[in-house]
Structure formats: structure tokens, C-alpha cells
């Protein structure tokens, strides 16, 4: 029994299946090649490859290196060609080259995206800054609401005259006085107070300006000289004439009293005093020449001689006396009865007699 033929038994054979697969692969390869050619014509790097130009990845390479690359790619395409008969080695090479050219383009697109984003952020920032500047400029240009000042008070001539007259009389006013003046001038107390303050300040400024003008025109005063006494010169003390004058002892020349003639006193310098002193001296001389004192002689010896001596001590004055001497020759009764010696006026007895004479002159 013969087996039926595979051709007759089945509507298709293995060859038909293989042919269908080959046709499908061929169709798919043709479509892919057309698509690749479309991309090659649009890409500038593929145009350069078709024209036989050199490829460079940022730097120029030798022709030998490019030939080696192309041969390596062709060998890879020949090794893998049995699986895909529709792809020729040239198409595979173009595919690899397209991938190699498209990769840098993708890498180039990434910085562009980053650059675009940075540009957009910068533009946004600039726009915000410009908006802020514009807003600040608008606010600065906008007029600020100014505080409304009170209108300035204008005084009449009569009011100013009265205020000036009162200011000359009294520079500072108390509260009641200010109220009274304000009511008389039909002003407020605050207005009067401010007017007086301004007037005082004006007077102060006028005085300052006047003093400055006088100081500018007037010459400066000469330096003051003060006499300083020199006490030491060249290591030696200096004595001034005034010190010498005051250093001498203070003394007044006066003659001693003379119990005989009683000369004139030397304390007066006037003519009247000199005349009075001369008259007193003449009277004293006349009195001393006409009046004398004498002691009579008395008995002496023993205890009974005391009374006799006492009696003998009484002065005997006579008009024709023998001068200023006192006779005391008979004073033997004193003591143990020794001999007595005559005494001069300078002794104690003579001094007592002279004292009586001086008292009479002073009384005169």
C-alpha cells in the first residue's frame, strides 16, 4: 500500500511554508530598507556617508581607521545575513551608522532640554524681578499722604505792636498773665506762648550775631602782664629794696629826759608842737632855777635817831635854794650810825624830788 503523496494529501507543502516565510521576510526587509533610506536622506550624517565623506565624533580620524570600521561592520552583517536574507550588508551598515549618528543627537537633545529649562527659569526670574522693580517704582512715584499742617497764624499790626510792647516789659509770662493777654488780643494762650518763645529765640540769635561781629572786628586784647618778684638769681637770694626798707628796725628818735633843763619833746613835727615844747622847756628852766630842796641836818646815833632822821627827811624848800642838789650829809641817824655820803639827783631821794617837779610841769 502506497502512502499518498504529500502534495496530493495536503493542500500545501513544506516548501510552500518556507516560501511564505521567505516572502514575508523579504517584504518586511524591503519595508525596513525603505524606511531606512527615508531616514538616511533626511539625516545630514547619512548624506555625508552617501557622498563618501568622513565621519567624526568630535575629532578627525584617519581613513585607515574608518576602513577598518567599515570592514568590521560588513563582516558582522555577513555573519548574521543567513537569518535575514532581506537585509543586505550595506543596509545593515547604514542601520548601525544611523544608530551611531542618532545617539549623539539624543545626547545633544538632553543639554538642549536642560538649557531650555534654565532659560525659562531665568526668564521667569527676570520677569518676577522686573515686576517687583515696577511695583517698587510705582510705590515710590505714588505720592505719600503728607500730614496736614495747620495754617500759619497771621497777626495783625495792632496785635504785634501790643505783643512787642509787653515783651519789652516782661520777657516771661505766667499762665494767668498769658491768658489775660490772649483774651485782650483775641488770641489763644498757645499762640501767645509760641509767639513769646519765638521772640526770645530771635533776641538770643541777634545777641549771638552781634557778639560774633564785634569779636571779628575788634582786635584781641593784649596779654596781661603780671610782675613776678625774683627771689633767687644765679643761686643767690635776691633782696628787694622794699624788703630792705621794711627790714630796718622801726625806731623813733627821742631825746632822754633832762631833769635840769627839760628840753623839748621830739615827737612832734608841726610848728605849734615845737612852740609848745619850747614854752614848756622855758617854764621848767625858770621853775628849777628858783625852786630848791634841802634836807636839814639832824642828830644821829642810837635808837632815838629814828625820829630825828624822819624829821630830817622832810624837804626844805627855799626861794634861794642852792640848785637841784639835795643835802643829805646829816643822815647819821639811819642804821648803825655810819657816816652819810651826799647823794646826786640820780639817787632815790633825788628821783623822788624830781618826780614832784615833773608832776607840776605836766599839770601845767
Curated annotation (Swiss-Prot):
Bilayer-crossing regions: none
Cell compartment(s), UniProt: Nucleus
Record-linked SMART domains: HOX (SM00389)
Sorted UniProt keywords: DNA-binding, Homeobox, Nucleus, Transcription, Transcription regulation
Comp. bias regions, Basic and acidic residues: 135-144
A GO cellular component entry from the record: chromatin
A GO term for molecular function: DNA-binding transcription factor activity, RNA polymerase II-specific
Superkingdom assignment: Eukaryota
Residue ranges of the region described as Disordered: 132-153
Gene Ontology BP annotations: CD4-positive, alpha-beta T cell differentiation; cell differentiation; cell fate specification; gland morphogenesis; leukocyte homeostasis; leukocyte migration; lymph node development; macrophage differentiation
InterPro entries reported for this sequence: HD, HD_metazoa, Homeobox_CS, Homeobox_NK-like, Homeodomain-like_sf
DNA-binding span(s): 148-207
Gene3D superfamilies from the UniProt entry: Homeodomain-like
Family: Belongs to the NK-2 homeobox family.
Main function: Transcription factor.
Protein's name according to its UniProt entry: Homeobox protein Nkx-2.3
Gene name as annotated: NKX2-3
